[in-house]
Amino acid sequence: TGRSDVCALPYGINTVSLFAYVFLVMLPAKMAAESTGAADPARVAWEAGLVACLGSGLIEFLGSFVAERVRRATPRAALLSTLSGIAIGFISLGFLLRTFARPIVGLTTLGIIMLTYFGKVRFKGGLPGGLVAVALGTLLAWITGIAPAAASPHGAGIFLPVPVIGDLLHALMSGYGLTYMAVIVPMGLFNVVGSLQNIESAEAAGDAYKTMPSLAVNGLGTMAAALFGSCFPTTIYIGHPGWKALGARAGYSVLNGFFMTAVCLTGTLAYIAWAVPIDAGMAIVLWIGIVIAAQAFEATPRHHAPAVVLGLLPALAAWGAMMAKNGLRAAGMGMPGGPPFTEALIQAFGKSDTWIHGAFALEQGFIFTSMILAAATVAVIERRFVTASLWCWAAAALSVMGLIHSYRWMPTDTVMSLRPAWPWAAGYAVMGLTFLAARWITTEAGAGPAEDTSSGA
């Protein structure tokens, strides 16, 4: 392109899928193996994870051929608002709590990041703010006793990757793909949509990448990971605007690859994690979350701001549901020897006017819900009511398929059930009919974009 300011797409482990595959695939597989007296339940869990990773990569690869059409049909506010909600809830809020739990390290490093990245100043000598924050944070963590958090590691050496094709074939023949299809398919689809949103985020920051090859390589990388023993899919990562604002360009991704390869294959990653605690760098991650959230407003038309706000709410609700369940586990519920999660929780939370049923419903497929609500809102703002109704009916269809809002109770969690979520499907259908009838049941209350009754987006 001749440009010197292009930032490469971030790439790494998909955190959402990691937790889904650990707790909804690998743990059940291990427990089932233990109940049948298998000789090596841990190996059974690993093989089930391999199949899940391979399946996710295949879905991502196939999805790359249709993803650009979805992207063109979806307003930018809908794509970016979902990332905004994830950035605020699952990135910024978690690290904000940690910052104020350990204020000496947290607030000091946050001040440095605010000074250099929000204030647009540099330290004398050309020292980058991120390096200063991590170095000072590490020093303060050791002085205050936060570090080290564990005993000194040992076992450095050379550990080259080994293909596990035979194990993967054995896992496929064992039928794990069919057993855990209800988890693999939704996670694969979520990865496709999430990657789409991150590509849109990169374009909003000034770096346009083609959708098909980006997602295709993403899927191929995930399948390659499974061939070498990884249970966790890779993804186009959230955070491109933050990395670009840090000064990262095309080379940072290559350097990341070389560095992570070196420390992982030599076993030295454990030493780095021991010496440099998470607290030392959490201000940078907090800042990246803020930048991602801000971009959703800065890179979209001003009058679409309500759509962005509505689109980020399901992700915040999902984060709230996770926090509520973590609190219940901390109190002993869902833990060994404690009471299981049951439907009685809905009534118990209701006594404090907490509608936890809604939070659990929003948690399932919140990436789809966020995108659809924001897209429908954009259409309503622009008075394209037929388009808004189509988005609502898409949500109704996803509800019938169980990809959003449908959940079931497990002793330790609430998880996606893939059963029809009829109440929500009906609600979305009626919502769509309301928008469809808008031209006959409403009158203009003020100036705005002309109504478009076409079915285009």
PLM segments and residue spans:
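Early transmembrane hairpin of solute transport permeases
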Residues: T1-L110, G242-V254, F258-V285, I292-T300, ...
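Hydrophobic core segments of alpha-helical transmembrane domains in multi-pass membrane transport
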Residues: A20-P28, C53-S64, L83-L93, G106-K120, ...
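Helix-loop-helix hairpins and the membrane-proximal interhelical loops
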Residues: G126-M212, M416-W424, L433, W440-G456
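Membrane-embedded helical hairpins/re-entrant loop segments and their flanking transmembrane helices
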Residues: T1-D5, Y176-A250
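Inter-helical loop and helix-membrane interface segments of multi-pass membrane transporters/permeases
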Residues: V25-E47, E68-R69, R76-A77, G85-R122, ...
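C-terminal ends of transmembrane helices
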Residues: T1-D5, L58-R72, I112-F123, L196-A204, ...
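C-terminal transmembrane helix-loop-helix hairpin of multi-pass membrane proteins
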Residues: F118-K124, D167-T179, H303-A457
